[in-house]
Amino acid sequence: MAKYRAGRINEEVKKEVSNIIHNDIKDPRLSAMVSVTDVNVTKDLKYAKVYVSIFGNEKAKEESLEALKSSVGFIRKEVGRRVKLRNTPEVIIEVDNSIERGMHIDELLHSIKENESNDN
């Protein structure tokens, strides 16, 4: 039962944080495409680690990350207003590079396949 509740809370917080980032944060530094990939809320509901994937050049990534980190208070307030929980979790922004790593692995596999077809 507890696992099911934790999963529901994680998904609800993920949905709301994504909506807040895309619709409510008006920071001009948030120019790169930001995707919320996962959220892990601790069992005591005190902390929520929000994993984001940021697409764009390095400068845009850094600026977007700074914008997100400076907006954690606003994000927390909005999550508390939109998701009815006993405690509003402290939001911690973490960068998730798994999508970029997956794209890199896909490129490597594609180049290996091309090399094998050229050898034959």
From Swiss-Prot:
It is found in: Cytoplasm. InterPro entries: KH_dom-like_a/b, RbfA, RbfA_dom_sf, Ribosome-bd_factorA_CS. The keyword Cytoplasm applies. SUPFAM superfamilies: Ribosome-binding factor A, RbfA. GO terms for molecular function: ribosomal small subunit binding. Belongs to the RbfA family. It comes from Clostridium botulinum (strain Hall / ATCC 3502 / NCTC 13319 / Type A). Keywords: Cytoplasm, Ribosome biogenesis. One of several proteins that assist in the late maturation steps of the functional core of the 30S ribosomal subunit. Associates with free 30S ribosomal subunits (but not with 30S subunits that are part of 70S ribosomes or polysomes). Required for efficient processing of 16S rRNA. May interact with the 5'-terminal helix region of 16S rRNA. Monomer. Binds 30S ribosomal subunits, but not 50S ribosomal subunits or 70S ribosomes. Its main location: cytoplasm. This is Ribosome-binding factor A.
